[in-house]
């Protein structure tokens, strides 16, 4: 019997980044949806977007599910899952983290990135009209999509939107998350150059007991090589 997946995107992205993965999963008899977070549609008013707006969006999607689903988060969505999952544990059959930020209690994403990166993004957001971090093309090409074809880089960059900085600066609490008994898996694209080697799997130690599935690809392999990511997700499924 097929599973139903709910995919949560990370910073700058929208639900569209999961389209290729969803198509691959549907070929295998699964169903899926990928909501776009507040402020992440083109033309959205991003001023005033708060961290809780993201969490509330996820919990509202979960509330509409008729039966438990597989909840998947990529990149910055990792810590959104840490905050949202405890609010709707009965709606979640399994949690899967894909090259995701897993934060310690009381920390924000900016606490786990190089200080110069956090400082540069903060300055850029302060200079913007809506407190957003603009799309940083060099970062996308040389870290998020290192080694990917230029045409794929261009395609992704054309769809990214400015990121409300609250996602990066808000500390989370993990007390409720660490008490969950939901099975957890990590699907890790092992060619990811967006952080130093070992950083993502190091953060994943905060998940406790989890299953690790490694696949090939960059941080953006969900967009550039969705078949490989879908295969990893299927391998990770708990029946």
Regions found by a protein language model. Name each.
Residues 31, 37-70, 86, 110-114:
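Active-site loop/oxyanion-hole signature of alpha/beta-hydrolase fold enzymes
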Residues 72-77, 81:
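Gly/Ala-rich beta-loop-alpha elbow adjacent to hydrolase catalytic centers
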Residues 158-177:
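Active-site nucleophile elbow and catalytic-triad environment of alpha/beta-hydrolase enzymes
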Residues 180, 186-188:
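Short beta-strand/loop motif that positions the catalytic acidic residue
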Residues 3-44, 69:
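Conserved HGGG/HGGXW glycine-rich cap/lid loop of the alpha/beta-hydrolase fold
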């Amino acid at each position: 019997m097929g599973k139903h997946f709910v995919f949560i995107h990370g910073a700058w992205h929208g639900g569209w980044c999961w389209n290729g993965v969803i198509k691959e999963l549907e070929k295998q008899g699964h169903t899926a949806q990928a909501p776009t977070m507040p402020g992440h549609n083109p033309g959205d008013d991003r001023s005033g977007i708060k961290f809780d707006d993201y969490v509330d969006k996820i919990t509202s999607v979960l509330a509409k599910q008729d039966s438990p689903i597989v909840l998947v988060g990529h990149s910055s969505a990792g810590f959104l899952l840490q905050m949202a999952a405890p609010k709707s544990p009965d709606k979640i059959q399994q949690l899967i983290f894909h090259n995701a930020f897993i934060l310690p209690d009381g920390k924000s994403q900016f606490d786990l990135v190089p200080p110069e990166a956090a400082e540069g993004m903060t300055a850029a957001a302060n200079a913007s009209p809506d407190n957003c971090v603009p799309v940083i093309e060099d970062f996308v090409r040389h870290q998020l999509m290192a080694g990917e074809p230029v045409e794929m880089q261009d395609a992704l960059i054309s769809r990214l939107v400015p990121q409300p900085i609250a996602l990066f600066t808000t500390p989370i609490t993990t007390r409720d998350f660490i008490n969950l008994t939901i099975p957890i898996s990590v699907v890790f694209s092992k060619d990811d150059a967006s952080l130093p080697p070992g950083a993502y799997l190091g953060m994943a130690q905060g998940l406790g007991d989890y299953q690790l599935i490694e696949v090939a690809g960059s941080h953006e392999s969900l967009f550039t090589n969705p078949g490989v990511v879908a295969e990893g997700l299927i391998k990770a499924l708990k029946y």
